[in-house]
């Protein structure tokens, strides 16, 4: 096989792979937090700390963009058998695809990043030096978000949560 024939083969394979990659992105939603969480949403999930039992929870959320452009998300979280806990997020875009946020239960600034249909968040929790790492994936239907969280102490995972969020707007 000549060098030019080999080059043509490689170019055709590369073109096919690029076409397949582009096609796989068609129909996939982009995670824009202020759009995804605008309005009302409901979440159901489970959290487990250390080796303890799994604790079911529900979350009712209401999100809106404020006059200054920041996005506010008010949440009521209920763990089974416990009173409702209210918390509030205030999020803003710092650069394209990058976010900062404050959260009632965080001891410092939360940072986030979007990549296609995924949002990743990281923030320190109040007390004990705990850090929450969350990965939220917007499904292809555009109405469901799957949230996986890992709670870490000194980098060691000590708890996790899984939640399915239904967007009802």
What positions do the PLM features span?
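Bacterial Sec-dependent signal peptides at the C-terminal "C-region" and cleavage site
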Residues: 18-26
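A short, Trp-centered hydrophobic/proline-enriched beta-strand micro-motif
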Residues: 37-45, 147
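Bacterial N-terminal signal peptides
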Residues: 9-19
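Short coil/turn motifs at beta-sheet boundaries
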Residues: 34, 54-56, 129, 142, ...
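Bacterial N-terminal signal peptides that target proteins for export
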Residues: 1-11
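N-terminal helix-cap/turn-to-beta initiation motif at the start of protein domains
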Residues: 26-40, 140
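Edge beta-strand at a domain terminus
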Residues: 136-144, 148-169
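Central antiparallel beta-sheet cores of small beta-barrel/beta-sandwich binding domains
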Residues: 27, 31, 44-135
């Amino acid at each position: 096989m000549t060098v030019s024939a080999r080059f043509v083969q490689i170019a055709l394979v590369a073109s096919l792979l690029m076409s397949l990659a582009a096609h796989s992105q068609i129909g996939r939603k982009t995670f824009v937090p202020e759009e995804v969480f605008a309005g009302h949403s409901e979440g159901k999930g489970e959290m487990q700390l250390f080796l303890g039992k799994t604790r079911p929870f529900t979350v009712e959320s209401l999100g809106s963009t404020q006059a200054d452009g920041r996005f506010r998300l008010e949440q009521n979280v209920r763990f089974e058998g416990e009173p409702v806990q209210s918390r509030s997020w205030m999020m803003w875009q710092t650069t394209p695809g990058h976010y900062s946020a404050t959260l009632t239960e965080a001891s410092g600034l939360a940072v986030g990043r979007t990549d296609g249909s995924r949002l990743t968040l990281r923030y320190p929790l109040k007390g004990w030096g705990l850090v929450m790492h969350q990965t939220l994936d917007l499904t292809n239907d555009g109405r469901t978000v799957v949230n996986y969280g890992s709670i870490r102490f000194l980098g060691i995972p000590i708890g996790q949560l899984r939640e399915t969020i239904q967007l009802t707007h």
